[in-house]
A protein has these predicted regions:
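Helix-loop boundary and gating motifs at the non-cytosolic
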Residues: 1-22
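Loop-to-transmembrane helix entry/capping segments in MFS-fold secondary transporters
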Residues: 16-17, 100-112
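Helix-to-loop junctions at the C-terminal end of transmembrane segments
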Residues: 32-46, 131-132
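Structural signature of the two symmetry-related core transmembrane helices
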Residues: 48-63
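Helix-loop junctions at membrane interfaces in 12-TM secondary transporters
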Residues: 65-77
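Intracellular juxtamembrane helix-capping segments at the cytosolic ends
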Residues: 87-100
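A membrane-interface helix-boundary motif in multi-pass transporters
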Residues: 129-147
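Multi-pass alpha-helical transporter architecture, strongest
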Residues: 142-169
Length: 169
C-alpha cells in the first residue's frame, strides 16, 4: 500500500494536493485511534480486535481498488487506516508488552518491526512485478483478499488474548 498508493492515485488523475490530503486523512485517523483505542481494548478481546483490523484492512484495499477515481471513496478508505494500522499497531505493542520481559521488550519490538518490514518489502516486490500486467485496481483487490488469510493465523493466538484487557489479571 505504502509503496504504490500515491502512484495509483496519480494514474487516476488525482492532483498532488488531493493525494497529500488523502495521506493526511490516514494520519489523522490513526491519531484519533491512538486517542480512543482504550475504548476498544477494554471491551473486546485482542483476538477479536486483530480479526477486526484484518477485515477493515481488506475493506480499505477493496474500496481503493474498486473506486480508484472517486475522491470520496478514497477518503473513506483512508479513514480505515485507524484500524488497518493504528489499532493493529497498538495491539502488537500490547502483545509485546505482555509476552516479553522488560529487558526483552526492545527485542520484541525489533522482531515486530522486522516482520512488518519484510511484509512490506515482499508485498511491494510482488505488487511491483504484477502492476504492469494487471494494473493497480487488480493489485489492490487481490491484496484485499490475501489479507483475509491472516484470519487463519488469529485462531492460533494464545488463549490469554481471548478476553478484553480490563478482564485480565
Amino acid at each position: 500500500f505504502y509503496s504504490f498508493y500515491s502512484n495509483y492515485l496519480k494514474e487516476a488523475d488525482f492532483t498532488t494536493t488531493e493525494i497529500g490530503f488523502l495521506w493526511a486523512v490516514g494520519v489523522i485517523a490513526e491519531i484519533i485511534m491512538f486517542a480512543y483505542a482504550h475504548l476498544f481494548l477494554s471491551r473486546y478481546s485482542l483476538k477479536n480486535l486483530v480479526s477486526l483490523c484484518l477485515i477493515m484492512t481488506s475493506i480499505r484495499w477493496m474500496v481503493a481498488g474498486l473506486f480508484s477515481n472517486s475522491f470520496i471513496a478514497q477518503f473513506a478508505a483512508q479513514t480505515i487506516h485507524a484500524f488497518s494500522f493504528g489499532l493493529f499497531h497498538l495491539i502488537a505493542m500490547r502483545m509485546i508488552f505482555q509476552n516479553f520481559s522488560a529487558g526483552q521488550q526492545g527485542r520484541g519490538q525489533a522482531l515486530y518491526s522486522t516482520m512488518w518490514g519484510l511484509g512490506v518489502a515482499f508485498g511491494s516486490i510482488l505488487a511491483g512485478h504484477y502492476w504492469k500486467i494487471y494494473g493497480g485496481s487488480i493489485i489492490f483487490i487481490s491484496a484485499s483478499g490475501i489479507v483475509l488469510l491472516g484470519l487463519l493465523w488469529v485462531k492460533w493466538l494464545p488463549s490469554q488474548f481471548e478476553q478484553p484487557i480490563s478482564m485480565r489479571n
